[in-house]
Amino acid sequence: ADGGEASMCLNGIRCAAAYVWRNNFAPKKIIKFKTKNRIVVCEPYKNQVKATLQIPSIYIDTKLDKKIAKLTSDKFSLVDAGNMHLCIKSTSVKNKDLNSIYKNLEKLIKPLGFNLSIYKLSKKIADMRTYENGVGETFSCGSAALAVASLCIQDKFKTISPGGELNFIKKNNANIEMMGPTKYIYSGNINV
């Protein structure tokens, strides 16, 4: 990681909620998190954590769209999901060189803070991979999954990334729920 700060981390927020409940820092009920640009409401859900937030919006930049279209023939969308994401629909995800795709687009998208996701759609499921600015390819990115889901969802949707699955339910025209597991790995102390 390059030390840069993201606007939010949805998987991190879900893990923070699970940590609070696990350690009895607050009752096991709704917790609201305020990020740089979103309110995320978390609540327990069948041994998982459900996060509810506003449906992402399409980012409109016709000049950027034209520049990206010169570098990829695949359908793509620019999405503001709390973090900015360039989502490219592909016929394959596993066999793609995500690093090369990112490097090809980096000069256009990195200065604007766009992460890159490629996804393959199959009915109500998207297989996906994400390259985050300053990090590289990640096992799972919650805001990327949210961005892809927002492009494809009618009522229910699932994303599958190398790190696992997230499920989405569109609640109305304004909100979407994201459900997924959290896993407690270890705890430690830092002396300062």
Model-predicted segments: where are they?
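Active-site proximal loop and beta-alpha junction motif in alpha/beta enzyme cores
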Residues: 1-8, 13-140, 147-192
